[in-house]
Amino acid sequence: VCILPNMSETAAQVLEGSDTKVCTVISFPLGFDWPDVKIHETEDALNKGAQEIDLVMNVSALKSERYDIVDEELEGVVKASHGKGAIVKLIIETPLLTEGQIVKACELAEKHGVDIVKTSTGFSAMLPRSTSVEDVRLIRSRVKPDTGVKAAGGIRTTADTLAMIEAGATRIGASAGEEIIGGL
């Protein structure tokens, strides 16, 4: 279950003893916080029971070629998370990026040991387009085989889901789960 950071402790208590993991989002949904804020928010969420971290990348920094900012946030968040046995999903917002920027985001994710690259926050009303099969295929081609790819954003049907899996997605994020499963 993925929740906002302020609910990490409550979710961890409610789910204690179950197989359901607590995931929390960091710098959601825009990713514009400074690296030190993201690192602190991550450490706090982990201390309160989060087992997975969904970090929204600073897209503005990436697009402005301020890779030092992205490096700093990734280094700190991955170190804090892996130190507690948690995985990190980096949300890169592919609908806002060029192909070259997607490639660069994947390079930075690999450099810092991100576990899963995620296409989007899914806030598609704010984005110029939804996640595409081509986005997933490009990410899959640019990350190591053991790095996961999570497709999210605009996935509403069984056909959408199967196309994303065929393109290389190892996880799907969708709010239409019941409809997707019903179509199988």
Label the predicted regions.
Residues 6-149, 157-184:
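Alpha/beta enzyme core
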